[in-house]
From Swiss-Prot:
Glycans are attached at N398. Residues 638-642 are annotated as: Interaction with S100A10. Residues 1-367, 449-463, 510-529, 618-765 are cytoplasmic. This is Transient receptor potential cation channel subfamily V member 6. It is linked to Hyperparathyroidism, transient neonatal: An autosomal recessive disease characterized by impaired transplacental maternal-fetal transport of calcium, high serum PTH levels and signs of metabolic bone disease in the neonatal period. Skeletal anomalies include generalized osteopenia, narrow chest, short ribs with multiple healing fractures, and bowing or fractures of long bones. Affected individuals experience postnatal respiratory and feeding difficulties. The condition improves within a short time after birth once calcium is provided orally. The lineage of its organism: Eukaryota, Metazoa, Chordata, Craniata, Vertebrata.
Length: 765
C-alpha cells in the first residue's frame, strides 16, 4: 500500500470499475451554470436588458441546449466512477477492502467525510455495494456517518439506511439501527419524486422503501425502532398510498395488510387507510384513480359484510363510503370520470360500482336525462322558429351594385313588436334568452370547480359539447344586444347559434347505448383525424394554388377566370381538392402546357392519395372506439349520472342504498348485492384444477386449501379426486379447455332493493 494520495492522486489499483447502477436509475437534467447570457455572435448582453433582449436570451439558451437526459445520466455515472477511482477511501469502501480502510483511517490527513460526485460518503458506497465489513469499519471510525445524507440534487437526503433497506441487507440495517440511524430521514432528491422520468417511486422514508421492496422483516424492525407509519412525503402520500402505485400488486396487498395491523389509532387519530394526501385522495380513491383493480378488490373485501350464504347465493352489504357521489365532493365516481387514465374506467366494471351506477341510472338518471333532452329539443325548436320569423321589412335604400340582390332588411326595434304575431315571437325570444342565461349559470360554475383543461378537454365529460352550448348561449345574448340597439348584422351570431344549438342535440345521444359511443367517435375524428388531415390539406392547397395562379397569370380572365387572382385561386383549388368542381376547361382556347401536368399531379395526390388516407384514418379510429364502446358508454353514463345528481335538488334525487343507522351499522350507507354462483360450475372448476395440478411436477401444497377456501357455499368439502378410468379416457387438453372456459364466465349479480323501499321485487343487472 502506497502513501495516502489526495483527491487527484492515483487510486488503489486492481479494482474492478464496472459501473454498478445505484438503486434509482433515472437522473435529472443538470442545472445550467449561471453564466452571463451571451449573444449568438459571442457578445455580452447589457445588464439592464429590456423585454426583447430577455426573451431573446431565453430563446438562445433553449435553442443551445445540448445535453439530453440520457447523456446527462451517463455523464454523471461516469463522473461518479471516476471520483471513486480517484479517492482511495471511496475505492476501498466499494471493494470491501477492510485492510486498506484500516490503514487509510490511521492517517490524520484522511478525510473520512469526503464525498463523491453524487454527494455520497464512503458509508453510502459501502451500503450501495452491500459491503457489510467495510460499513462496520467506517461506522466504528466515524459513527456520525450514519446520519450523513447525500447532498446532490439527484439523491438529496438519502442516508445509508435508505440504501441498505432498498437492497434488503438485513445485517447492515440492524447495524445502522443499533447506532441510532434516523428512521425518519427523508430522501427528497429528484430521483425519488413521482415523475415520468423516474422508473420507480418509493416515497421518501426508509419505511416506505422497505414496504415497496416487500421486506416484511425490515418493515417490522423499522416500526419497532420508532418508524412512523403515518409519515407523509412531499406529496402527502403515506406508505399505503405508495403501495397502491407499485407494479407488484400481490406483494402490495400483503404489505398493506401488514401495515394496517400496526395501526393503533386512538380517538383523536384518523385511521391510516383514511388519511388523504395533498390531492385529497385516500389509498382507496387512489387505487380507483390509478385503475388498480387488484388493490381495489382487495380493499373492497375489507369493506364488505357478508350477511348469509344459501347454497350458490351470497348476500353481501358493500360500504359505499368514498364511492357514492352523494354527500362527497370528491367521490370515486367523479374521480374516475375526470382522470385521463384509461385504466381507471375498468373500476366501473367492478362490484359494487357497477351495481351502484346501474341502480342510479335506471331509477333516476335515465328518466331525468330523457326529460332534459325533450326540454332542450323544444327549446331549440322555439329558438329556430324565432329566427325564421324574425322581423324584416322591404328594402328602402337603392342598390349600389348590380350584383346586389337584397330585397328585405332588418326592422328597427320600434317597428319589430307591433302586431300580435310579433308578441308571440317576443314570448319565444324571451324564453330563448332566459334559457341562454340558465345555460351559462349552470356551465360557468363547473368551469371554475373543475378547471378549464379538465372541463373542456375530457371527452367522457362531453368537453366539445360544453364548448358548443356555452358559445351558443353567448351568440344568443349577442343577438339580443344587437336587436336592442338596432344594429345591422344580427344574422351572423344568429346563424352561428342555430348551427351550434342543433349540433348540441347530439349530446343527448349518450343516453342510448347504441348512439352514445358514436358521439365520442365523431369527437375523436374531428379533433384527431380531421385536424391532422387539415394540416396536410393546407400544405397541398397552398402549393398547388400558387402553381395554378402562376400558370394562369398571363391568360385572359374572361376565358379562364378560376385562377385570376390569388384568393380565387385558393378557393378554386380547395373546391378541386374536395372534387366539388371539375378542372377549368374551355375548348375554344388553348390551355397552358404546364396546367395539364400540374393538374394531373394534383388529382393523384388530392383525390387518390389524401382522401383515401383520411378514410383509412377514420376507419382506424372507428375500429379502436368500437372495441371499447361498452366501456366508453359506461363512463358516459357515470358522468351523466354524477352531473344530474349534483344539479338536481335532494328531494328529486334521494340517496341510493341502505342507511346503516337503522340496522346498527353506523352512519354509513350500504348497497346489498346478491351474487349467484353455479354449483355445477364450481365442481367442474375443482375437477379441472385437480387435473391441472395432478400433472404438474411442482405441486403447491397450499393450492388445495386455497381452492377449498375460495368456495363460499361449501367450505367443509374436500377436493374430489377423479377416477383413473376417467382420467385415462379423456384428454388433458380438453379438461384444460373446459377449465379455461368456466373460469372466463362472468358471474351474474342481483340487487335486492326490498330493504330500501319496502318492496319485495328484485332488480337484475
Amino acid at each position: 500500500m502506497g502513501p495516502l494520495q489526495g483527491d487527484g492522486g492515483p487510486a488503489l489499483g486492481g479494482a474492478d470499475v464496472a459501473p454498478r447502477l445505484s438503486p434509482v436509475r433515472v437522473w435529472p437534467r443538470p442545472q445550467a451554470p449561471k453564466e452571463p447570457a451571451l449573444h449568438p455572435m459571442g457578445l455580452s448582453l447589457p445588464k439592464e436588458k429590456g423585454l426583447i433582449l430577455c426573451l431573446w436570451s431565453k430563446f438562445c439558451r433553449w435553442f443551445q441546449r445540448r445535453e439530453s437526459w440520457a447523456q446527462s445520466r451517463d455523464e454523471q455515472n461516469l463522473l461518479q466512477q471516476k471520483r471513486i477511482w480517484e479517492s482511495p477511501l471511496l475505492l476501498a469502501a466499494k471493494d470491501n477492502d477492510v485492510q486498506a480502510l484500516n490503514k487509510l483511517l490511521k492517517y490524520e490527513d484522511c478525510k473520512v467525510h469526503q464525498r463523491g460526485a453524487m454527494g455520497e460518503t464512503a458509508l453510502h458506497i459501502a451500503a450501495l455495494y452491500d459491503n457489510l465489513e467495510a460499513a462496520m469499519v467506517l461506522m466504528e471510525a466515524a459513527p456520525e456517518l450514519v446520519f450523513e445524507p447525500m447532498t446532490s440534487e439527484l439523491y438529496e437526503g438519502q442516508t445509508a439506511l435508505h440504501i441498505a433497506v432498498v437492497n434488503q441487507n438485513m445485517n447492515l440495517v440492524r447495524a445502522l439501527l443499533a447506532r441510532r440511524a434516523s428512521v425518519s430521514a427523508r430522501a427528497t432528491g429528484t430521483a425519488f419524486r413521482r415523475s415520468p422520468c423516474n422508473l420507480i417511486y418509493f416515497g421518501e422514508h426508509p419505511l416506505s422503501f422497505a414496504a415497496c421492496v416487500n421486506s416484511e422483516e425490515i418493515v417490522r424492525l423499522l416500526i419497532e425502532h420508532g418508524a412512523d407509519i403515518r409519515a407523509q412525503d412531499s406529496l402527502g402520500n403515506t406508505v399505503l398510498h405508495i403501495l397502491i402505485l407499485q407494479p407488484n400488486k400481490t406483494f402490495a396487498c400483503q404489505m398493506y395488510n401488514l401495515l394496517l395491523s400496526y395501526d393503533r389509532h386512538g380517538d383523536h387519530l384518523q385511521p391510516l387507510d383514511l388519511v388523504p394526501n395533498h390531492q385529497g385522495l385516500t389509498p382507496f380513491k387512489l387505487a380507483g384513480v390509478e385503475g388498480n383493480t387488484v388493490m381495489f378488490q382487495h380493499l373492497m373485501q375489507k369493506r364488505k359484510h357478508t350477511q348469509w350464504t344459501y347454497g350458490p347465493l351470497t348476500s353481501t352489504l358493500y360500504d359505499l363510503t368514498e364511492i357514492d357521489s352523494s354527500g362527497d365532493e370528491q367521490s370515486l365516481l367523479e374521480l374516475i370520470i375526470t382522470t385521463k387514465k384509461r385504466e381507471a374506467r375498468q373500476i366501473l366494471d367492478q362490484t359494487p360500482v357497477k351495481e351502484l351506477v346501474s341502480l342510479k341510472w335506471k331509477r333516476y338518471g335515465r328518466p331525468y336525462f330523457c326529460m332534459l333532452g325533450a326540454i332542450y329539443l323544444l327549446y331549440i325548436i322555439c329558438f329556430t322558429m324565432c329566427c325564421i320569423y324574425r322581423p324584416l321589412k322591404p328594402r328602402t335604400n337603392n342598390r349600389t351594385s348590380p350584383r346586389d340582390n337584397t330585397l328585405l332588411q332588418q326592422k328597427l326595434l320600434q317597428e319589430a313588436y307591433m302586431t300580435p304575431k310579433d308578441d308571440i315571437r317576443l314570448v319565444g325570444e324571451l324564453v330563448t334568452v332566459i334559457g341562454a342565461i340558465i345555460i351559462l349559470l349552470v356551465e360557468v360554475p363547473d368551469i371554475f370547480r373543475m378547471g378549464v383543461t379538465r372541463f373542456f378537454g375530457q371527452t367522457i365529460l362531453g368537453g366539445p359539447f360544453h364548448v358548443l352550448i356555452i358559445t351558443y348561449a353567448f351568440m344568443v345574448l349577442v343577438t339580443m344586444v344587437m336587436r336592442l340597439i338596432s344594429a345591422s348584422g344580427e344574422v351572423v351570431p344568429m346563424s352561428f347559434a342555430l348551427v351550434l344549438g342543433w349540433c348540441n342535440v347530439m349530446y343527448f345521444a349518450r343516453g342510448f347505448q347504441m348512439l352514445g359511443p358514436f358521439t365520442i367517435m365523431i369527437q375523436k375524428m374531428i379533433f384527431g383525424d380531421l385536424m391532422r388531415f387539415c394540416w396536410l390539406m393546407a400544405v397541398v392547397i397552398l402549393g398547388f394554388a400558387s402553381a395554378f395562379y402562376i400558370i394562369f397569370q398571363t391568360e385572359d380572365p374572361e376565358e379562364l377566370g378560376h385562377f385570376y387572382d390569388y384568393p380565387m385561386a385558393l378557393f378554386s383549388t380547395f373546391e378541386l381538392f374536395l372534387t366539388i368542381i371539375d378542372g377549368p376547361a374551355n375548348y375554344n382556347v388553348d390551355l397552358p402546357f404546364m396546367y395539364s401536368i400540374t393538374y394531373a399531379a394534383f388529382a393523384i395526390i388530392a383525390t387518390l392519395l389524401m382522401l383515401n388516407l383520411l378514410i383509412a384514418m377514420m376507419g382506424d379510429t372507428h375500429w379502436r372506439v368500437a372495441h371499447e364502446r361498452d366501456e366508453l358508454w359506461r363512463a358516459q353514463i357515470v358522468a351523466t349520472t354524477v352531473m344530474l345528481e349534483r344539479k338536481l335538488p335532494r328531494c328529486l334525487w334521494p340517496r341510493s342504498g341502505i342507511c346503516g343507522r337503522e340496522y346498527g351499522l353506523g352512519d354509513r350507507w350500504f348497497l346489498r348485492v346478491e351474487d349467484r354462483q353455479d354449483l355445477n360450475r364450481q365442481r367442474i372448476q375443482r375437477y379441472a384444477q385437480a387435473f391441472h395440478t395432478r400433472g404438474s411436477e411442482d405441486l403447491d401444497k397450499d393450492s388445495v386449501e386455497k381452492l377449498e377456501l375460495g368456495c363460499p357455499f361449501s367450505p367443509h368439502l374436500s377436493l374430489p379426486m377423479p377416477s383413473v378410468s376417467r382420467s385415462t379416457s379423456r384428454s388433458s387438453a380438453n379438461w384444460e379447455r373446459l377449465r379455461q372456459g368456466t373460469l372466463r364466465r362472468d358471474l351474474r349479480g342481483i340487487i335486492n332493493r326490498g330493504l330500501e323501499d319496502g318492496e319485495s321485487w328484485e332488480y337484475q343487472i
